[in-house]
Amino acid sequence: MYMKITKIDGVSHYKKQDKGILKKKWKDLDERKQREKIEARYNKQIESKIYKEFFRLKNKKRIEKEEDQNIKSLYFFIKELYLNEKNEEWELKNINLEILDDKERVIKGYKFKEDVYFFKEGYKEYYLRILFNNLIEKVQNENREKVRKNKEFLDLKEIFKKYKNRKIDLLLKSINNNKINLEYKKENVNEEIYGINPTNDREMTFYELLKEIIEKKDEQKSILEEKLDNFDITNFLENIEKIFNEETEINIIKGKVLNELREYIKEKEENNSDNKLKQIYNLELKKYIENNFSYKKQKSKSKNGKNDYLYLNFLKKIMFIEEVDEKKEINKEKFKNKINSNFKNLFVQHILDYGKLLYYKENDEYIKNTGQLETKDLEYIKTKETLIRKMAVLVSFAANSYYNLFGRVSGDILGTEVVKSSKTNVIKVGSHIFKEKMLNYFFDFEIFDANKIVEILESISYSIYNVRNGVGHFNKLILGKYKKKDINTNKRIEEDLNNNEEIKGYFIKKRGEIERKVKEKFLSNNLQYYYSKEKIENYFEVYEFEILKRKIPFAPNFKRIIKKGEDLFNNKNNKKYEYFKNFDKNSAEEKKEFLKTRNFLLKELYYNNFYKEFLSKKEEFEKIVLEVKEEKKSRGNINNKKSGVSFQSIDDYDTKINISDYIASIHKKEMERVEKYNEEKQKDTAKYIRDFVEEIFLTGFINYLEKDKRLHFLKEEFSILCNNNNNVVDFNININEEKIKEFLKENDSKTLNLYLFFNMIDSKRISEFRNELVKYKQFTKKRLDEEKEFLGIKIELYETLIEFVILTREKLDTKKSEEIDAWLVDKLYVKDSNEYKEYEEILKLFVDEKILSSKEAPYYATDNKTPILLSNFEKTRKYGTQSFLSEIQSNYKYSKVEKENIEDYNKKEEIEQKKKSNIEKLQDLKVELHKKWEQNKITEKEIEKYNNTTRKINEYNYLKNKEELQNVYLLHEMLSDLLARNVAFFNKWERDFKFIVIAIKQFLRENDKEKVNEFLNPPDNSKGKKVYFSVSKYKNTVENIDGIHKNFMNLIFLNNKFMNRKIDKMNCAIWVYFRNYIAHFLHLHTKNEKISLISQMNLLIKLFSYDKKVQNHILKSTKTLLEKYNIQINFEISNDKNEVFKYKIKNRLYSKKGKMLGKNNKFEILENEFLENVKAMLEYSE
């Protein structure tokens, strides 16, 4: 049973309302009619079937455009046989059998291998090549009608019919296997407690196996292992051995192995004495062989078919073939263990799904009240769990920030009492002094009453604690409570946050700053320097600030709109796109700054004004769709490009449907349309849809700008500076204060709780979470016909609070006056004897002391004593990565030599009565040479000069980033992403753990069930405090359930190894420690026994030994994450004596490459030194 419901042309599966049985829709149709509908759908996809099973067309052409009549005739000949429908597109005389061997033109697929039979029936073997030969020899020169009457043709037709029928039978069987064949049964008539009843053989088999494992828990040997030992595949492996010893040609080996597999499976299927469990086991064997012997795998492992030797070595590896005295032998024990592991994996996934369905049936209001459980409902479960993992990541970041306030991480700091030491009169937790770091999170914390600081800190602590418990408990967030000490009784009592006047007052104060913050955002983007007061006033007569912005799926973000607008303007200087005209990226600095300002003004209009208006005007949207199509066609005609017709195949818009539904539907249809092409072609064709949607929104946005003359100034070019004397420019912002108060209620404890929580997390993280919330909201609205809350909280509240936090959060960057700088630095750093020694000591970790001794920019102000705050670098301190990164950077500090190199670049000489630095001269030279290239007037020598200039500019940029510690910040971002990813994986493991416990609970004795219930829903502790489910409690609870521990752990840890030790009652603390190491970010804080990030990845892979997909994703996600930073990483496997696979970095890290002028001229985006930094960070341990 999979958490997926197969759907083919309307055949879906759902839960029957009256009995809770999950079975096929179309319950009134008999099996024959169901098969007819599936066959009709299959025939509609026949083109993709032929491509997949028989053909790979050269240069990815479609068959209709194929000029070679050999290829075309063969294709349509097969199509007629496959569909059993006549077509007039083939001539037998055009088919040349030699093309069957041309690997560049036709590749035979799964049932269609070189010199291997195509179909077998009893003892008869049908070779496609022989059948073709017989037909061609007899009637090659005859017309189609005579060919169709020929015996050999009719034989082929019959074979294809059997072939297709077998495919459809397998598909129907797959549907039956993939549907959820379960029945809920009430464990207790009076309570909503459910168990599971299977309703088909496959589910019954797994159900009975699970029951047997749990009930026979006192057996000495694992029941599962004992059953697997009885599944003997020795004879099959011996036959495979013979093939590898007798054959050398790769396609013959593949074909014969697959034939042997089919014979073996068929024999076992016909042998009714084999039990159902063994049949499932044989299917796992079949999947393993077919996957690794597929054309797709051959292509990937042989470098696109260029080196079959590499693929042959791969096959030997996955078949565990060892060379002994020049004879190839399969290590049968290793191979058997591999299939055993895959079978166990499948088994555990079924158990997980049992538990997951039971949990949601009992606890989720939507699933509990759902009459028919369909695909969309399972998608809802999956989407909700993904969002829960995202929020678990935020909890770890928030808790880490809280730790950074106190400097302590041992134990659980959340929800613990904050005390005030009477001796030192400072805030303390344990023995660690609380430093004044509140400024990092609550900028004006002086407004808090000094006597209330302890209560405020407790409020922050409990705000995180409450969210953590809600995420861990899976149901809903119970927010707004905290505990404070009662003065009279000296006991801690529970209190509502809306009764905390300090927090409520601060919230009201920040809410009142929204208008000022919006103004500051515009002023910080320098609009007052590039636009006159009149133009600014015109702009703000139009602009309307929205704290809750509307979003829809697939709508392009503004970065894509800008890029599309720039590209289309540069195409023959099309005046329609004047709002997006760009200067050369290497033009004068002031022009680049102007573009930033103009684009910011456009972006604010795009999200706040345009979006809501555009999505509400269906008639206008309809016209724009037609306009975009016509314009694309015209551009294609002018440039004589066939791409001009790419938009014509996309459906027009019908005003009867919502705009968001239309955009979603054209994406979906395009994915279905390109299904018939290979993967590379899918990516190319899917891009047409993205381009189409981008042009629709771009055209709509331009129309919006054009209709209001007050905004026409935004297409004007920059000429002179305005207000260059720093004159204050004032303007009014259109803000609906009542609407803001409607969302941001100071008397709502939940709102205050989430506000404190989000305030402890970096803006980037909460912004990413907001995007995930929007996807969740859009999914529930579209698929479930109603917007769902998330953990009991409306999505709009999350969105509004996150926008509020990001907007009103103070930026820790350099201020406009040195007096304000000094004030800010005084709050952030300890001042000792009129010197900022703490600041200097931190800088020494990353910068050579000789550089700091002069106390100059960019680290100190002009008074040579006041520190300059580097905002991004400050984040490493705020979020606790600074200490760890200083260890990584100890051998890569910014040096005196690098400073001298920057000074050389910045040396100025007088040129044409203007002083220009060396770097400015290089930038001017690059612009000049680039213009020559655009005019086709550049020489080869000048191209080389251009590329050398580019390298020097890149070197300068790297040195400047290093000087300003941007490289450290980039490492901080990368490290944070890796830590977040690990938290998400561990949260999934904890969820799986809980679901498995739920699944096995129904098989336990009543006494043990009570213990499990206590484990899943712990009672309040002795102090009356609510205790929530936690995997870390396992050591003290589950081990008390008689006999369950060993068998249970054998299900989760299939290899019985973790951190190179056996999991048993005595050392459960090992993996509990690893869980805490990940969840509490101990990697940043422990002074010794650090587990490297690569080792963490390996341990996570071991932890998910029961889920191969997740194991693969752990590795892949590491690569994907680093690719985001332009880093390419390769792994290799080292195998220790205990046969525990470990991945390590292969050789070194590599930078992605950027393009330069000239053919094949590229440069590495990242410097080697930075790549070494990243490698050191990934491998660092103590």
Curated annotation (Swiss-Prot):
Query: What EC number(s) does its UniProt record assign?
Result: 3.1.-.-
> Which parts form a coiled-coil structure per UniProt?
132-279, 896-955
The organism that produces this protein has a lineage beginning with:
Bacteria, Fusobacteriati, Fusobacteriota, Fusobacteriia, Fusobacteriales
Q: Which controlled-vocabulary keywords does the entry list?
A: Antiviral defense, Coiled coil, Endonuclease, Hydrolase, Nuclease, Repeat, RNA-binding
- What remark does the entry make about the cofactor? Pre-crRNA processing is metal independent, while crRNA-guided target RNA cleavage is dependent on divalent metal.
Taxonomic superkingdom: Bacteria
The keyword Nuclease appears for this protein = yes
One GO biological process this protein is involved in is: defense response to virus
Protein name, as recorded: CRISPR-associated endoribonuclease Cas13a
